[in-house]
């Protein structure tokens, strides 16, 4: 019984206290009459402007570098890169400042005429080269005689037939192949320019063998002199053939003849 009476009296006191106060602390805190706990909370617009989620009223505050450059007079003519970037992207009013590269290019170069638009610019004239020579065309007639002389061999160049040309392996005389020259230099130049050097040789196998003897005259030199030289060379070749050099060519190895003269057997 006693406990129930105490509880009822406590509840009655609390109800009377609430009726006596009735919103007075809230009104006092809003009017500034109550000491606010903690730091002062800014308004909602100020918070949004500080966080960047609300369009900021008034002009945008430039960075510190821009302010220092604007207050530091006299300053260089070209502003720093940070100032240029802020002027181009930070504040839209006012004429845009050209990039740093454009400013340097405009200040370093002398006044130049305006560059015409791309459709008005013409390509440079294409240079015309001289026609190339044909693969077998001879530019001058001086090389024609040299080609004829090389194609006919050393016999035609010297005018005297070699001694080895008259003597074969057995020592018998073989008729030399006649060399026919063209009637005019123009025809010879045309034929020499159109055919390879190998096709211009009118001689046969016997003449090529004589050419090889003349190139390697030290291997085919005769012991005797005069008219007996050819016979001595033939006898020497026969002796070499009997000694086991039959696999060679005129007493020499075939590969050696091929590398030195290019003719072979």
From Swiss-Prot:
Record-listed Pyrrolidone carboxylic acid modification sites: 27-28, 31, 47-48, 51, 67, 71, 88, 107, 121, 127
A GO term, aspect molecular function: toxin activity
InterPro entries xrefs: Natr_peptide, Natr_peptide_CS
Keywords (A to Z) from UniProt: Cleavage on pair of basic residues, Cytoplasm, Disulfide bond, G-protein coupled receptor impairing toxin, Hypotensive agent, Metalloenzyme inhibitor, Metalloprotease inhibitor, Protease inhibitor, Pyrrolidone carboxylic acid, Secreted, Signal, Toxin, Vasoactive, Vasodilator
GO biological process: blood vessel diameter maintenance; cGMP biosynthetic process; negative regulation of blood pressure; negative regulation of protein kinase activity; receptor guanylyl cyclase signaling pathway; vasodilation
This protein's record includes keyword Lipid metabolism: no
Propeptide: 24-26, 44-46, 64-66, 81-87, 100-106, 118-120, 126, 132-215, 235-243
Chain coiled-coil ranges: none
Biased composition (Low complexity): 184-194
Tissue: Adult brain regions; ventromedial hypothalamus, paraventricular nucleus, paraventricular organ, and the subcommissural organ. Also expressed by the venom gland.
Region of interest called Disordered, as start-end residue ranges on this chain: 153-211
GO-annotated cellular components: cytosol; extracellular region
Phenotype upon changing residue 78 to A: Low decrease in ability to enhance AsS activity
Protein name per its UniProtKB record: Bradykinin-potentiating and C-type natriuretic peptides
Biological source species: Bothrops jararaca (Jararaca)
Organism placement in taxonomy: Eukaryota, Metazoa, Chordata, Craniata, Vertebrata
């Amino acid at each position: 019984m006693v406990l129930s009476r105490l509880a009822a009296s406590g509840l009655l006191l609390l109800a009377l206290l609430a009726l006596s106060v009735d919103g007075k602390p809230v009104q006092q805190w809003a009017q500034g009459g109550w000491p606010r706990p903690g730091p002062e909370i800014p308004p909602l617009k100020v918070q949004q402007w500080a966080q960047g989620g609300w369009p900021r009223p008034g002009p945008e505050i430039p960075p510190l570098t821009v302010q220092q450059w604007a207050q530091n007079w006299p300053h260089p003519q070209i502003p720093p890169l940070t100032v240029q970037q802020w002027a181009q992207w930070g504040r839209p009013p006012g004429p845009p400042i050209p990039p740093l590269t454009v400013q340097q290019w405009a200040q370093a170069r002398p006044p130049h005429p305006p560059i015409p638009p791309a459709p008005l610019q013409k390509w440079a004239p294409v240079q015309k080269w001289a026609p190339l020579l044909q693969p077998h065309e001879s530019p001058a007639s001086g090389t024609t005689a040299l080609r004829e002389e090389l194609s006919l061999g050393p016999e035609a160049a010297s005018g005297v037939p070699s001694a080895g040309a008259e003597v074969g392996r057995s020592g018998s005389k073989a008729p030399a192949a006649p060399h026919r020259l063209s009637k005019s230099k123009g025809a010879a130049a045309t034929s020499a320019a159109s055919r390879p050097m190998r096709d211009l040789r009118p001689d046969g196998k016997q003449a090529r063998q004589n050419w090889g003897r003349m190139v390697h005259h030290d291997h085919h030199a005769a012991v005797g002199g005069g008219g007996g030289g050819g016979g001595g060379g033939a006898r020497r070749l026969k002796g070499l053939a009997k000694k086991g050099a039959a696999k060679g060519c005129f007493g020499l190895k075939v590969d050696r003849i091929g590398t030195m003269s290019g003719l072979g057997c």
